[in-house]
């Protein structure tokens, strides 16, 4: 194999990062040397590799299997939970920008003080064909209405979801149910403590009680949980009340505009209560992860798991009930900077979130998580490292707020790939400049009040409340980014050693 001599020693593979030129490679705003920033970003990547590397540790894998098995137990009690191979697990929690759920309050959790690593799990509880009359898209607000007839595919869906029904769609003047089915090129807070013997009923604005990455970023199926009371393997259940003759043709007794809707608030309430009932019945098993906290915040059920072996980690999983829609919105983009993105079939999600113009009103929001996962695989590694560093710097500034900044930062990542040359983004020595560029772009977006939606042409993502205060905090951070990165590296070192740092809501883990 041919080799090249670098500094008198043979080197196989790509050349190392070129050293920065001290007199020219300096950040004009802060005076920081870009070479130092890049080195700090690389150190941050090393310290965070325990939870974000290509080969997760055994504790992370056990925690993932625990959550999948927990959902499997819920499926045994309520077959509306999906049976198998329908889960999408993503690295990073909702508060770190894994998804856009609007500006609803998502609790006091902050990576570092409350948990060491976070993940988001999409749990499809309903699926439909986007070309039918059941789906109404409101592309102005990037939201949708899901109407339920008496029968769908021979199943009495309205009877099955009777406890989650809402009123009919108020008006359809600005809505459409147009999606195409061909393949897509892009393819109030409730809490439960397992130590108690009761499950509180979901109520709006209930205060949080005291409590003690995608690992593979792919679809996963349930596995049996470590529980002496449920040693048998998971089986797919059916309910006589839900079954109907598959050959029966739906004959709705009223027009589609009179159909009741599937209410996202009721769905998330049902999702949490069912999960909490099973969590309360779990028997701790030595060597297995321990569920120390579960709570519902808007459309998200957040659980914290403590790993059993040292170094002890506290892992956060945001579980979200979603609707899978087959088809593709007519106004959605079909190409990225890397060309068409291949997928098995055209589909997207509906997730429970808050409406952009009415933060206090819940609704189904369009979500393209599977396409974003494919996009991430096309992003150059140095730019991903720069984004991770920018996330780490942003994290303490938005902790406990309703700010949409983390997902805005993620969207800026996609627009950067559209705008900048791939060779520039792929050079390791440019990571420092890219990190500062993302933060500067975010400040401009906060000042403008909106950012163009990456997937829906002509639509915008809103910045939400608190943008002025966040702009001020970002300006202060930009005055000394090197110091902010050093603090992020130290925080990552603490998380790597094991946390359980501070209890959520003042409790202990």
From Swiss-Prot:
GO biological process, one term: positive regulation of T cell migration
Positions of the UniProt region annotated as Disordered: 167-236
Record key words, sorted: Apoptosis, Cell membrane, Membrane, Transmembrane, Transmembrane helix
Membrane-spanning ranges: 313-329
UniProt topological domain (Cytoplasmic) ranges: 330-509
Subcellular location: Cell membrane
Gene3D superfamilies the UniProt entry points to: 1.10.1410.40
Superkingdom field: Eukaryota
One Gene Ontology CC term in the entry: cell surface
Positions with biased composition (Low complexity): 207-224
Extracellular domain ranges by topology: 1-312
Topology in membrane: Single-pass membrane protein
Basic and acidic residues composition bias: residue spans: 174-204
Cross-referenced InterPro entries: MAB21L/cGLR
Function: Selectively involved in CSF2 deprivation-induced apoptosis via a mitochondria-dependent pathway.
Subunit organization: Interacts with CSF2RB; this interaction occurs preferentially in the absence of CSF2.
Protein name per the record: Transmembrane protein 102
Protein source organism: Mus musculus
Gene field: Tmem102
């Amino acid at each position: 194999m041919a080799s090249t001599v670098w500094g008198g020693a043979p080197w196989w593979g790509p050349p190392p990062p070129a050293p920065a030129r001290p007199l020219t490679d300096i950040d004009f705003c802060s005076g920081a040397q870009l070479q130092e920033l890049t080195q700090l970003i690389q150190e941050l990547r090393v310290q965070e590799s325990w939870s974000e590397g290509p080969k997760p540790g055994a504790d992370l894998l056990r925690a993932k299997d625990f959550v999948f098995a927990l959902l499997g137990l819920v499926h045994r009690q309520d077959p509306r939970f999906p049976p198998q191979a329908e889960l999408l697990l993503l690295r990073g929690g909702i508060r770190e920008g894994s998804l856009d759920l609007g500006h609803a309050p998502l609790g006091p959790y902050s990576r570092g003080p409350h948990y060491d690593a976070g993940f988001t799990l999409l749990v499809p509880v309903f699926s439909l064909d986007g070309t039918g009359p059941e789906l109404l898209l409101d592309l102005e607000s990037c939201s949708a209405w899901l109407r339920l007839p008496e029968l769908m595919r021979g199943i009495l869906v309205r009877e099955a979801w009777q406890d989650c029904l809402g009123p009919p769609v108020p008006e359809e003047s600005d809505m459409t149910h147009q999606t195409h089915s061909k393949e897509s090129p892009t393819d109030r807070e409730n809490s439960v403590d397992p130590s108690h013997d009761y499950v509180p009923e979901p109520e709006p604005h209930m205060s949080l009680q005291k409590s003690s990455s995608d690992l593979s970023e792919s679809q996963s199926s349930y596995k049996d949980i470590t529980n002496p009371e449920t040693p048998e393997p998971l089986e797919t259940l059916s309910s006589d009340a839900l079954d109907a003759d598959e050959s029966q043709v739906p004959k709705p007794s009223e027009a589609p505009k009179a159909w009741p809707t599937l209410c996202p608030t009721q769905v998330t309430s049902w999702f949490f209560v069912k999960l909490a009932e099973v969590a309360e019945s779990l028997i701790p098993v030595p060597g297995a992860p321990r569920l120390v906290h579960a709570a519902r915040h808007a459309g998200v059920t957040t659980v914290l798991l403590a790993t059993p072996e040292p170094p002890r980690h506290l892992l956060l999983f945001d579980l979200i009930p979603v609707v899978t829609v087959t088809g593709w919105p007519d106004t959605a983009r079909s190409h990225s900077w890397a060309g068409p993105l291949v997928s098995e079939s055209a589909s997207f999600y509906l997730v429970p979130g808050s409406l952009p113009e009415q933060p206090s009103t819940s609704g189904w929001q369009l979500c393209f998580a599977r396409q974003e996962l494919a996009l991430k695989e096309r992003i150059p590694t140095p730019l991903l490292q720069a984004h991770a560093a920018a996330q780490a710097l942003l994290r303490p500034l938005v902790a406990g707020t309703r700010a949409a900044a983390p997902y805005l930062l993620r969207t800026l990542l996609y627009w950067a790939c559209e705008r900048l040359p791939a060779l520039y983004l792929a050079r390791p020595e440019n990571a420092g400049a890219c990190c500062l560029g993302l933060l500067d772009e975010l400040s401009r977006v906060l000042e403008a009040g909106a950012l163009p939606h990456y997937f829906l042409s002509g639509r915008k993502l809103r910045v939400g409340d608190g943008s002025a205060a966040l702009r001020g905090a970002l300006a202060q951070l930009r005055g000394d980014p090197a110091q902010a990165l050093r603090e992020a590296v130290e925080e990552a070192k603490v998380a790597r050693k094991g946390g359980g740092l501070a209890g959520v809501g003042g409790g202990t883990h």
